Amino acid sequence: MPNSNNQLLKEIRFDWNKEEILEILDMPLIDLMWESQTVHRKFNKYNIQLASLFSVKTGGCEENCSYCSQSIYSASEIKSHPQFQVEEVMARAKIAKNEGADRFCMGWAWREIRDGKSFNAMLEMVSGVRDLGMEACVTAGMLTEEQASRLADAGLTAYNHNLDTSPEHYKNIITTRTYQDRLDTIKRVRNAGINVCCGGIIGLGETNGDRASLLEVLSNMNPHPESVPINSLVAIEGTGLEDNQEIDSIEMIRMIATARILMPKSKIRLSAGREKLSKEAQILCFQCGANSIFYGDELLTTSNPSFQSDRKLLKEVGVSFNKDFETREKTLFSL
């Protein structure tokens, strides 16, 4: 372990290197769980943020992400639809709130945000969700500084833009957008005063070194992303990665635990692929540092545990729903 536990509890770092992270990621599991749980207890209460995700516009994306069924390059048989009307989205947000969610995430299958009627509707949706007393998150691809500013003015809590994988493995997953494009988008979001939601996916054919490299980029962002979604690949027929094998749940536990050690105060979100995890594996993820989940029976194009099953699980675990999200003040972003 590159740092003693006492040192881990004293400081939050932004200078982790890949070798240190690999050493943590490869620790004996029982030691890794102990270290991550100790950090988690120090910096976070045992409560879980419930984020509900809704696909506002599905399919037809111009990017060639090899894991995604919404890409125009995918042969997946998904049900595409144009952008929902504001009223329809607000109805879904109200359902999510009534079920206990405190964040409503809205997804658009776009390469980038484009000005016009659709963007104006997005701004209206953001304002409407905030008026419900919920946090509002958007994921819609790249954006300009002006668009980020307008989203901030509308009250957007967070913008999601994942890195997906390591800089080294990235070219094997997507070629229509560069890694630097993603980092530039994150910088614009941060500089507009919007919280950053940024994570990645495991199970894309990457090595353990790639996972460490992804975590190196995330943990050296200053400040750290407020939310860090950790996804496991859901291999969908018709996508470029349809034949990839499911990851072992221990790999997800290791990724969650390492992310918690590196980014002590971030919301570590147990995201896509959670339905494949056993109840026991999910509990270990919560113990090791996961303190946010996607809540509701559907993500963008994949299934998820139901509201009812998640409430039952959280009650068994003994954690509370999270209502105390900390909004960071506007601060310039550095990489």
UniProtKB/Swiss-Prot annotation:
GO annotation, biological process: biotin biosynthetic process
Keyword Magnesium assigned: no
Cofactor binding: number and manner: Binds 1 [4Fe-4S] cluster. The cluster is coordinated with 3 cysteines and an exchangeable S-adenosyl-L-methionine.
Gene3D superfamilies: Aldolase class I (3.20.20.70)
EC numbers, comma separated: 2.8.1.6
UniProt keyword annotation of Glycoprotein present: no
Binding residues for [4Fe-4S] cluster: C61, C65, C68
Requisite cofactors: [4Fe-4S] cluster; [2Fe-2S] cluster
Annotated metabolic or biological route of this protein: Cofactor biosynthesis; biotin biosynthesis; biotin from 7,8-diaminononanoate: step 2/2
GO MF term list: 2 iron, 2 sulfur cluster binding; 4 iron, 4 sulfur cluster binding; biotin synthase activity; iron ion binding
Keyword terms of this UniProt record: 2Fe-2S, 4Fe-4S, Biotin biosynthesis, Iron, Iron-sulfur, Metal-binding, S-adenosyl-L-methionine, Transferase
Catalysed reactions, semicolon-separated: (4R,5S)-dethiobiotin + (sulfur carrier)-SH + 2 reduced [2Fe-2S]-[ferredoxin] + 2 S-adenosyl-L-methionine = (sulfur carrier)-H + biotin + 2 5'-deoxyadenosine + 2 L-methionine + 2 oxidized [2Fe-2S]-[ferredoxin]
Binding site for [2Fe-2S] cluster: C105, C137, C197, R269
Role description: Catalyzes the conversion of dethiobiotin (DTB) to biotin by the insertion of a sulfur atom into dethiobiotin via a radical-based mechanism.
Family classification: Belongs to the radical SAM superfamily. Biotin synthase family.
Assembly and oligomerization: Homodimer.
The protein's name in its UniProt record: Biotin synthase
Organism, scientific name: Prochlorococcus marinus (strain MIT 9312)
Lineage: Bacteria, Bacillati, Cyanobacteriota, Cyanophyceae, Synechococcales
